[in-house]
Amino acid sequence: MDNVLPVDSDLFPNTSTNTSESNQFVQPTWQIVLWAAAYTVIVVTSVVGNVVVIWIILAHKRMRTVTNYFLVNLAFAEACMAAFNTVVNFTYAVHNVWYYGLFYCKFHNFFPIAALFASIYSMTAVAFDRYMAIIHPLQPRLSATATKVVIFVIWVLALLLAFPQGYYSTTETMPSRVVCMIEWPEHPNRTYEKAYHICVTVLIYFLPLLVIGYAYTVVGITLWASEIPGDSSDRYHEQVSAKRKVVKMMIVVVCTFAICWLPFHIFFLLPYINPDLYLKKFIQQVYLASMWLAMSSTMYNPIIYCCLNDRFRLGFKHAFRCCPFISAGDYEGLEMKSTRYLQTQSSVYKVSRLETTISTVVGAHEDEPEEGPKATPSSLDLTSNGSSRSNSKTMTESSSFYSNMLA
């Protein structure tokens, strides 16, 4: 993904050929003011919101779950991208003059790809965690240490993927201005550039979204379309409802990301189909709009968490308790009120003529916090009674399908 405009259209400095020295895309002041206000909203909302999300998770033991660690990584990547790239993107797109030097030119083209990779693969890791928790509940879950290793690997791969674009970025001084561009190695038909852009688009957009879509489709079918026969308590329904809320929240997060970034990826694939399109006068406004939509994806997640998750809502209320129109809420519920009430429920499962009584440890709608005790699944010894309930045996299951929940 390029975050600068190619030079050959004087709106996009990505190549070193056909360079125009004049700036044809000068906007009236009122347009610049409107765009500046729109981009300011992104920066403020994203940085503040994502920093609060990080604080809510790291400052409260009950929030330090495997899934939430990935949400911390997602929030960090999005806050950094909003802080370090959004304003620079805007000023360069408006003025088409590079004010920030060679080092930041390289960083400006390098970091967004790394941040996007880290963001989307954090969502992929959450989808995988939900898939394992719901589809394979008796399989071992990631520990806090393993989760941190996964996050580290995600960033290493992200930096490697972004390296070529940062390496080939450079500045060029013209008589009237300085531009930031990417000088790819010379090759017929711009083969290296095309291959890299297509590879990046597949790896940071289409492939992870395909994996996430499959995971949540299977999880959704399991949670919404499957019913376990037999009696079910109110607590059972509460657990299923909690799981559904978590999955629904993450689906909203992923769909928001996909919608926000699709126009931007399409915009940067267009030059390989119709290069003359970038010569049009309106293309600057199209770029500013698609870039605003893409950058705005960094500010929506904190809003989604606050609206769809009770604990995040409590955390946001506490963080902004000084605001006159926000009630503090039950802040103790964020730290002290654990929903991991280990209640033992007896559920009778009737399958044909077999009746088996299972005494199940009902878990919370959250993963285990980092410091909390970890339940280890035991094998199930189901004993059928043949014809008489009096001959049935009772056994305890230390980890059940409905005992792995997310905050």
UniProtKB/Swiss-Prot annotation:
The keyword DNA-binding does not apply. This is Substance-P receptor. Glycans are attached at N14, N18. It comes from Mus musculus. Keywords: Cell membrane, Disulfide bond, G-protein coupled receptor, Glycoprotein, Lipoprotein, Membrane, Palmitate, Receptor, Transducer, Transmembrane, Transmembrane helix. Disulfide bonds join C105-C180. Gene3D superfamilies: Rhodopsin 7-helix transmembrane proteins. One of its GO terms (cellular component) is cell body. One of its GO terms (molecular function) is substance P receptor activity. The chain crosses the membrane at residues 32-54, 65-86, 107-128, 149-169, 195-219, 249-270, 284-308. Residues 376-407 have a biased composition (Polar residues). SUPFAM superfamilies: Family A G protein-coupled receptor-like (SSF81321). A lipid is attached at C322 (S-palmitoyl cysteine). Residues 55-64, 129-148, 220-248, 309-407 are cytoplasmic. Residues 1-20, 362-407 are annotated as: Disordered.
